[in-house]
Amino acid sequence: MKKIAIIGGGAAGLAAAIATGNELVRLGAADECEIVLFEADPERVGRSILATGNGRCNFSNAHIDPACYRNTDFVEAALRSLARLSGVSEWGSAQPVGAYGASAQGSAQPAGTSEAPGRESTQSASVFEAPVQRFFSDLGLMWREEGEGRMYPAANKASSVLDVLRAALDVSGARVEFGKALSAIEAPARGKGRFHLRFSDGSIAHAEKVVLAVGGRGVSAVDTSSVIPCELTRPVLGPLATDSRITRQLNNIRVKCAVSLERSGSLVAREEGELLFRDYGVSGVCVFNLSRFACEGDVLSIDFLPHMSAADRDAWLFARRKHLSARLGGNGQIAAEDVLRGAMLPQVAQVLCKCAGIDPARPLSKKDVLALSRVIGGLRLTVRGIGDAKQCQVSRGGLSIAAFDPQTMGAVRASGLFAAGEALDVDAPCGGYNLHWAWSSGLLAGVSAARSAVSADGEGEGE
């Protein structure tokens, strides 16, 4: 009996195991192969899923665009390949077939009144979204769509996503071995036979087909040198450390703003949203997204009034100075702290004044107004690096995508080896994109591994 090993019981690994089992059943080969999922956690699979989306699990996005991903062309090719496997046309129509095998009726429910309505059917989903939506619809998950296309389970708890995955895993035919952290993988002799899997507890396993879904941090701990090149990973999608002389004065204060990332005077990227000041730097979704591109020495420019042009901001401050001076009986004289009162928190106003070289308690001159306006539109912080690696949601690096075929997720020069999820050098911004990639690549790798195990030549070509 051939063995298919799934390494890692996170999002990608669970999707791969379920898809492998489903495809073997569809091919009438469930009795010919053994599926074993090796999970590093000593007790359970999917623990990492419970922490996503602040415990709510932003499991996908309703507007998936491959351009949002690192290594865009590879991701687009993989998503299109998965769509073809699941019977999705270019416009998301047609009934699902193959490993997904279920209708998509009633897959989503409307959200609350403050949210955009969720999809009532996956028929309206695009070629990039439909396969994942159909997969979860088949498992019985109900969801809703919130702002910016973020998709959450209707139960509003990450555990509901894990519950349907674990139920599907139970009937997939996969056997789970816990406490198995992979330390090395060795290729079959002369390219034929079984892969040798070495684990940190000293045990060894063998498998004809292997799906590596160990995550970004996990892949760095695996010696893959005999089968595939692997780049060291570094944490991204997290807070940034900056010059803390400014940020420590604003620790734990949140502001709505726009943040631009600049390098050598040129714009690298820009994000709008909520920013959280920390004693070591800055955090928040907009910062997390910029961290994917940030390098030490770059500059973050924070615009506290992003919907005003520089001229409008100047005019606003002059008009505010004039109005409040008359209102407060200042005879044309009013301090900066009075002008900013009601528009910004006092701590923020104090820091902005200090950065503009203004005494917040002294009358605000015309020159001071212009200086303050410039700082409000561009408080500058120098990036020192990642602020807290433990908060980072993904890793940059891992297995080189050049070594894999996006049509199958199979290794080009190591037949029988597949990879999925964050183990590959693919990452995306916040909003459900990274989990969407985990499910998608896991499903594609699982189907391909099953077909490879069953096919006469073992190459796993699509039917």
Regions found by a protein language model. Name each.
Residues M1-A12:
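Beta1/beta-strand and adjacent pyrophosphate-binding region of the FAD-binding site
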Residues A5, G21-N54:
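Glycine-rich FAD pyrophosphate-binding loop
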Residues A5-I7, F38, L182, I204-R217, ...:
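Short hydrophobic core segments
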Residues P42-E43, L50, F59, H63, ...:
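An anion/pyrophosphate-binding glycine-rich loop and adjacent beta-alpha core
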Residues G53-G92, S124-E148:
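Glycine-rich active-site loop/strand segments that organize a redox cofactor
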Residues F178, Q350-D427:
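A glycine-rich dinucleotide-binding beta-alpha-beta segment and adjacent secondary-structure elements
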Residues F178-G193:
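A conserved short coil-to-beta-strand element within the FAD-binding core of flavoproteins
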Residues D425-V454:
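A conserved FAD-binding loop/helix module that cradles the flavin
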